[in-house]
Amino acid sequence: MSKKEININNYNDDAIQVLEGLDAVRKRPGMYIGSTDGAGLHHLVWEIVDNAVDEALSGFGDRIDVTINKDGSLTVQDHGRGMPTGMHAMGIPTVEVIFTILHAGGKFGQGGYKTSGGLHGVGSSVVNALSSWLEVEITRDGAVYKQRFENGGKPVTTLKKIGTAPKSKTGTKVTFMPDATIFSTTDFKYNTISERLNESAFLLKNVTLSLTDKRTNEAIEFHYENGVQDFVSYLNEDKEILTPVLYFEGEDNGFQVEVALQYNDGFSDNILSFVNNVRTKDGGTHETGLKSAITKVMNDYARKTGLLKEKDKNLEGSDYREGLAAVLSILVPEEHLQFEGQTKDKLGSPLARPVVDGIVADKLTFFLMENGELASNLIRKAIKARDAREAARKARDESRNGKKNKKDKGLLSGKLTPAQSKNPAKNELYLVEGDSAGGSAKQGRDRKFQAILPLRGKVVNTAKAKMADILKNEEINTMIYTIGAGVGADFSIEDANYDKIIIMTDADTDGAHIQTLLLTFFYRYMRPLVEAGHVYIALPPLYKMSKGKGKKEEVAYAWTDGELEELRKQFGKGATLQRYKGLGEMNADQLWETTMNPETRTLIRVTIEDLARAERRVNVLMGDKVEPRRKWIEDNVKFTLEETTVF
């Protein structure tokens, strides 16, 4: 993809515009970074990295280095033009404006970026506000400058020249220490950062991104010569491949478009879309353009070649996307950039759809005409997908009609114990392993808003099965009907009967397996539930410690071995320890107190921070290939003596 060159002289102090002050960032950090947990902590990293990415995206710098330092701080070094070092119109150094004024950045003037995801200043000031200290070092115009901020963004030094450098050497280095009084954790995760940098490297063809962890001496570099083509190969790494990677690129109205496509033998699609290197997880007009182009071109080809007869209806888009892995990356000029809502999760720029549609349609049409046998195989695969879809819809409709004809008291063959409330915004559905635990849960629940659905039979592995076979599985079918929002392409989150879907299983390998099967189903066929944060895992205690009898009995619970050791010290000698092997060992009161009471329970919310990472993880753990799964288990699972039986 061609890059729009921007004159280095135009990126100066006048290019930084100020929109508003930095007030309230420390008071309401969630408004700026989403949360103050681990996700919010790493959002600070993304803000600074995105600034460096923008420089590389605009053609300045071919390397970005991230370092987790021994003291827990983090450094991002780019080799771009270097932030402006002169005085701003406000009467203070421009660097100080960038790091202390909210929404001061290069995006808003004409001399900064033509396309941009993050911006020097826009995120920098937020990172500074939420750090106990921050240092910025700038190499530019043959000199090296440095400034330090402390206590949430207050400058403690002015911008000083601290040395010289060759005029050819430029860049910005930012080091910051997150404020432990704001974040629940300040522990940067090597794997989380490395996977995000890997994704960015795919989108920045021939730019090297590195991560070094000085705490553990781990280090890794990412560099991809083929960009999004390599990205698609990465997504399909553990799958059976049906086609080579198809790559299309083009430019129209200032929009630059790159698309890579490849088909595998799976039954679901995986489309990742990006705007100015920022992931648009909810898609948008650019993704709509891609999908419409594929559907239109494939149907036209099927008609011309006679694979679809006159009497046949056109295939649906979902038929052509079965088994498709695709990466769409577009660069949108600032004057056309428009997102829906406050986040950058969905592109709203109207012009993006016809631009992407036109480029992809032209290139895909040519490819199909040049590769007739492969094209025909893809059409036949889509026809099979249509047949499976129609069979699945018929089975689903029959299932729904059969359930609706039953009396309320016989609902779901007596499986579901419904909540009294009819308010979906408050109701919770517990998916409980086994009848015995289901019985305790029914007795212990708050019947006003908690519904119980025991899972008695085997849950099918939905990563391997066709939709028609999935709907034959009684447990899956019951869940679909209970949740009430459809499944797959027909899923509508607005119709869901519950605000929280809570998976509650035993704390053993069987329980973990059931969790994995259920999460795979939700990920594949009810993904909006997961993306919107409606799926949870209950966390029952592992231990119960008691001492005394009758009214004098003391009881406490431990969820980890560390908590157990604390209880041992607290209770001293004479205490009784019970290790829970299953939910059924707890009576109704204990289950309510430890696992179901909103005031005292602990729930794990299931989220998708990185879709590419999630897709690969599901493929490895639930797919057909044994060797990648064995390797992942060997690398990531520690087997202890507690899990080993010695005879």
From Swiss-Prot:
Pfam families: DNA_gyraseB, DNA_gyraseB_C, HATPase_c, Toprim. Mg(2+) 1 binds at E433, D506. Residues 391-421 are annotated as: Disordered. Its cofactor is Mg(2+); Mn(2+); Ca(2+). Heterotetramer composed of ParC and ParE. NCBIfam families: parE_Gpos, PRK05644.1. This is DNA topoisomerase 4 subunit B. The gene is parE.
